[in-house]
Amino acid sequence: MSFLKLTKSIQKINNFNNNKINLINKYFSTTNINNSGGGGNIKLNDGRIFKFEDKQTPLTIANKINKTIGKQSILSRLNGNKLISMKEIIEMSGKDYNIEFLNFEEHSDARICFWNSSSLVLARATMEYFKNENKEIELINFGHLVNPQTADNINQGTFYIDIFFKDKNQTIKDNDINKIKKIMEYIVKRNDKFEILKNDQQDQDQDQEESFIKFGEFKFKNNFLTIDSSNSIVSLDLIKNSSVVGPNKEYSELQRIVGISFPSKDQMNNWVEIQKIAALRDHRVIGKDQELFFFHPFSPGSCFFLPHGTKIYNKLLQFLRLEYRKRGYQEVISPNIYNQKLWETSGHWDNYKDNMFSFECDHTQYSLKPMNCPGHCLMYAHRARSYKELPMRIADFGVLHRNETHGSLSGLTRVRRFQQDDAHIFCTPDMIREEIKQCLDFMKYVYTIFNFTFHLELSTRPDSYLGELSVWEKAETSLSQVLTEFCGDKWTINHGDGAFYGPKIDIHLKDANGKNHQCATIQLDFQLPIRFNLEYSGGLNNNNNNNNNNEEINDNNNNNSLNRPVMIHRALFGSVERMMAILMEHTAGKWPFWLSPRQCIVIPVSNKFNQFAQEIQSKINLAGYDVDVDLNDSKLLSKKIREATVSQYNYIIVVGQEEIDTNILNVRKRDLPEDNKQVKLSLNDLFSEFKLNIEQFK
């Protein structure tokens, strides 16, 4: 099926679903129920009020209003904040409630509930299957896989389980997946109920309530809400199985099964069509077709970039290097290998050593660096610093290595060897606000060039935070103010999800396919400067970035004291490899001229004009543009042009006797309409157009 037909098919499905929702909403607005008697009032989101008697459940309320609502609702929200199941009893006597019914199509909370429930079906089916196979497993994790920033997309959520084989040589095979799916389908048809069981346990200090979900003969310890019964899962599939990193040495490697499910076959069909479109844009396919990169089992997770892929990679770095020059960053080069003592000082050895490649040399333990920040702290600390040197913005494109499990490796999006557009800013506390603002402006500039939209999220103090509470509160207040100045109220708070060393701003970008990615991050770090004893001298009332509305975090600044700087971690691409993967899928391999590895190709109409074609190629090449020439005499001219078009050359230059005589080139532009692709240009005019394309990022 063609890309266009797939897109039209999905649009028809979406239009059909939207029409159904509109008809239901229209019915609600014209229907009223007025039960007589005592009880309480139920107010809906649209403002209508209904009176109900006795004890009610959201399901009985919904069915009395409209049975379609009762059928489609998965959860309900009581009084604007409390999520309850459709079967939970509401005491109506003398009380009024606001209630909202949540369906799968429109509400992320409902989808999360649905996929959590689906994970229990998968867990039960998997345990039943391996029990019959006499293989011992342990269920470690289960639930939904929904990024908070992708939760608004019906087609970007899944469910999963992680299991541990007692026999570590065991793995999940395709045949196992097929049989587990059949058991799931049987469980769904049987329409088993999900039951919430609660055990009250008296603790010495407090009452603790543990929740269990009983499903068939199995009990699952968890407190998430579920659907009422399994037959609400109309359509399901298992789409992936792989190994993932376990939580500790005892469970060092787990086996993960990922599935997808929907309450209607139409939604599943829609999802399948979208996967077909995604397959056409898969960066692994584009990378192979355009000869950009490949992987080899002799070095798993480490990419081999071919010449054309390297051109894109270097252009991305060149783009950032030019911006660094404009924005006051200094590029540095730091070592790849560090003594274990560095990682003990930074705290990574206790928390991250399992993700590091380590080895022994001269009876000393060393590791390949997985991040640049500790090395940059050494750079800051190698001599005394004054407040006059701050802010110090240093950037590093050094190679990083992280020991990802083999099963988690996936194209360029999850690798072991990569480079980050990593930068660290050392500044005084009262510079934080201005530096964060500049980082956000930088991010917006970059993402606008790539035609990404984005959403900002402030992650605040976690329970495991280190440092003074007052420092955290002032930092979070400062970041909140900057975000509000930057984008008004179009940002969200992710409570308790900050790093232990400081709050952070996560940036979630959306590509042309509607897929969300977290690449950029801006993090405050109060702990590494303490661990590495970083200091600067002086600073009272001497900073150009003072803001009367921004309190200083460090109140001990004076000209004779040594003060602690704040460290800001900043990345825009995340890893260059991952950004390349996103851009491949975002552009579907149709690179804009400024990034393109195939900017131009020269094709002679016959071998008689090969020399002239080579002369044109040489001039374009020496002018600094990526140009090829096709001198293959065994191919017809039409085939050469067709192959160049499929290969996504931005410009195709065809030369023959007329071009020699007139010194005017016959140029075909990829991005012009089909009936207007060919133009006549002199070589100088062509260079002017190339230069303009690069300046305007076209």
Curated annotation (Swiss-Prot):
GO cellular component: mitochondrion
Residue intervals of the TGS domain: 38-100
Localization per Swiss-Prot or TrEMBL: Cytoplasm
Molecular function terms from GO: ATP binding; threonine-tRNA ligase activity
Swiss-Prot/TrEMBL catalytic activity: tRNA(Thr) + L-threonine + ATP = L-threonyl-tRNA(Thr) + AMP + diphosphate + H(+)
Enzyme class: ligase
EC annotation from Swiss-Prot or TrEMBL: 6.1.1.3
InterPro entries the record matches: aa-tRNA-synt_IIb, aa-tRNA-synth_II, aa-tRNA-synth_II/BPL/LPL, Anticodon-bd, Anticodon-bd_dom_sf, Beta-grasp_dom_sf, TGS, Thr-tRNA-ligase_IIa
Keyword line: Aminoacyl-tRNA synthetase, ATP-binding, Cytoplasm, Ligase, Nucleotide-binding, Protein biosynthesis
Transmembrane segments: none
One Pfam family cited in the UniProt record for this chain: HGTP_anticodon
Region (Disordered): 541-560
Similarity comment: family membership: Belongs to the class-II aminoacyl-tRNA synthetase family.
Protein name per the record: Probable threonine--tRNA ligase 2, cytoplasmic
Organism: Dictyostelium discoideum (Social amoeba)
